[in-house]
Amino acid sequence: MTQYDERQMHILDQALNRFDSSRSVLEKHLPYDHQVAGHTKEILCKYNGYILKPLVKPDLFIRELSLYEEFESIYPQDDEKFMFAKYYGAVQAITHHNGVVHYIVLSDLTLNCKIPCIIDIKMGQQTYEPSVSELKKLREKQKYVYQEEIGFRITGLKVYDSECQSYTITDKKFGRSLLPDQVLDGLALFFYNHKTLRLDVLDIVIHKLNRILNWMLVQTRYQFYCSSILIIYEGDTALNEDVKHSVQVKMIDLAHTICVDGLVDTGYIHGLRNLIGYLEQLKEMSKTEENTLEEYNRVVQLINIPEMIPFVSTEAFEGHEVVDSSSS
């Protein structure tokens, strides 16, 4: 049983009451089948339109829970929290080992998608907190030596190939293997469905990223370390629904966020600006059929070079049964 101090217990009680004042324990939750990144022990679950993020390390769990609770008081209106998944509190649930684990309850961002395409992008020039050991800093820097230069890296993606009716899935090593001149191609992979570049999606994603950037430029309370941006869109172009309802761009994985006073998060801003710049470049290139074909060929070549093949897989689409979870 995890031991919390009085302040931590207050945060946990507040979060548990927010979701369900009766404190009932969930039993019918299922593994989440669209996780493309995250630590191997942090397997998400789903329940009635919610995503359940489990307690793995108690201190980090409470920190993230505390942050979401703070957002609820600082930003009382939902539209003020547009950059985050909707937060519902915390809950206890039975594990497959018949133990009881606490979970953070968030909205399922894939709920409006029949065939969701998902990319997880680790943001910031620095993916470790300033207080960690020199060894930890070195290990984090070695994960992707271009993180400081580029300000982000792809930690996992799955994109639907409409021609083959299957998913292309990459793991964490794919993103770490991208050289600076390959990053555009890595991002392009996510917006191609084998037939065309999803310009309709790209426009919305750029708009939403700019909204987050504008918020980051004025907020001076939070420094986000080891946090990601999750981008989701509907992969089935045969649906006649408006694509904008499926496109989600959210900041996730907030456990390593530090509260500060009077400082903008320059590392995160650097990464956001570069990410938006790459996507603008991709959009510009797609204005001619010749450039679009050239970029698509570059993407195909990228995922078929010997160094990349071990990091890319293909799985047939069977409803919502594709699972890919790995440490980021």
Feature-to-residue mapping (PLM):
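Polybasic, positively charged surfaces/segments
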Residues: M1-S328
